[in-house]
Amino acid sequence: MGKENSKVVVLDFWASPYAMRTKVALREKGVEFEVQEEDLWNKSELLLKSNPVHKKVPVLIHNNTPISESLIQVQYIDETWTDAASFLPSDPQSRATARFWADYADKTISFEGGRKIWGNKKGEEQEKGKKEFLESLKVLEAELGDKSYFGGETFGYVDITLVPFYSWFYALEKCGDFSVEAECPKIVAWGKRCVERNSVAATLPESEKVYQQVLKLRQIFGVE
């Protein structure tokens, strides 16, 4: 059995936008995989053993070898399953540009950034979180422009990096009392376009389900 055909397992938590990246990438490549859902409050021995440094999902296990960090996993998937189209452009300059924007999205549109909105009651800290979130989205929207995807007509690396957070927009809007579409209509249109892809539709949870999870987190962290 070739390496690209051996068993693939994702240690997952359904609401994790980072784990969603990995699952979207695998589905884009047509790779069959198993999902092991993790209880993040009672992590499995397999998760702790597979990712001893960060102890976080997602972990991609391929041929019994664990790989941590979602963007590293997406690159690994791209380099391992080469029969399907690459997530990155062929020329070095365009690849570098895509990596720059994926890195920007990863650093600015994040779980921690979202927590500044849902993890605070209405007030100065939440307003600061909203401002930072929307400013970053507007930078990404300017880069997207009128293109179908960040890579033009091709769904790729930057799209895979950012699209999981589309499923969190509704929860952030509800907690922060704002509209992403009013501020960044092209980003929302892009998100809707991405969800038309089977890989994304099969991966992203319903926005209401994410919102209910966020309400639980607010209770756990004493926000409510």
From Swiss-Prot:
<comment type="similarity">
    <text>Belongs to the GST superfamily. Tau family.</text>
</comment>
<dbReference type="InterPro" id="IPR045074">
    <property type="entry name" value="GST_C_Tau"/>
</dbReference>
<dbReference type="GO" id="GO:0005829">
    <property type="term" value="C:cytosol"/>
</dbReference>
<dbReference type="InterPro" id="IPR036282">
    <property type="entry name" value="Glutathione-S-Trfase_C_sf"/>
</dbReference>
<keyword id="KW-0597">Phosphoprotein</keyword>
<dbReference type="GO" id="GO:0005737">
    <property type="term" value="C:cytoplasm"/>
</dbReference>
<dbReference type="InterPro" id="IPR045073">
    <property type="entry name" value="Omega/Tau-like"/>
</dbReference>
<feature type="modified residue" description="Phosphothreonine">
    <location>
        <position position="154"/>
    </location>
</feature>
<feature type="domain" description="GST C-terminal">
    <location>
        <begin position="91"/>
        <end position="217"/>
    </location>
</feature>
<dbReference type="InterPro" id="IPR004045">
    <property type="entry name" value="Glutathione_S-Trfase_N"/>
</dbReference>
<feature type="binding site">
    <location>
        <begin position="69"/>
        <end position="70"/>
    </location>
    <ligand>
        <name>glutathione</name>
    </ligand>
</feature>
<feature type="binding site">
    <location>
        <begin position="16"/>
        <end position="17"/>
    </location>
    <ligand>
        <name>glutathione</name>
    </ligand>
</feature>
<dbReference type="Pfam" id="PF00043">
    <property type="entry name" value="GST_C"/>
</dbReference>
<keyword id="KW-0808">Transferase</keyword>
<dbReference type="InterPro" id="IPR010987">
    <property type="entry name" value="Glutathione-S-Trfase_C-like"/>
</dbReference>
<dbReference type="GO" id="GO:0009407">
    <property type="term" value="P:toxin catabolic process"/>
</dbReference>
<protein>
    <recommendedName>
        <fullName>Glutathione S-transferase U28</fullName>
        <ecNumber>2.5.1.18</ecNumber>
    </recommendedName>
</protein>
<dbReference type="InterPro" id="IPR040079">
    <property type="entry name" value="Glutathione_S-Trfase"/>
</dbReference>
<dbReference type="GO" id="GO:0006749">
    <property type="term" value="P:glutathione metabolic process"/>
</dbReference>
<comment type="function">
    <text>May be involved in the conjugation of reduced glutathione to a wide number of exogenous and endogenous hydrophobic electrophiles and have a detoxification role against certain herbicides.</text>
</comment>
<dbReference type="Pfam" id="PF02798">
    <property type="entry name" value="GST_N"/>
</dbReference>
<feature type="binding site">
    <location>
        <begin position="56"/>
        <end position="57"/>
    </location>
    <ligand>
        <name>glutathione</name>
    </ligand>
</feature>
<dbReference type="InterPro" id="IPR004046">
    <property type="entry name" value="GST_C"/>
</dbReference>
<keyword id="KW-0963">Cytoplasm</keyword>
<dbReference type="GO" id="GO:0004364">
    <property type="term" value="F:glutathione transferase activity"/>
</dbReference>
<dbReference type="InterPro" id="IPR036249">
    <property type="entry name" value="Thioredoxin-like_sf"/>
</dbReference>
<feature type="domain" description="GST N-terminal">
    <location>
        <begin position="6"/>
        <end position="85"/>
    </location>
</feature>
<keyword id="KW-0216">Detoxification</keyword>
<feature type="binding site">
    <location>
        <begin position="42"/>
        <end position="43"/>
    </location>
    <ligand>
        <name>glutathione</name>
    </ligand>
</feature>
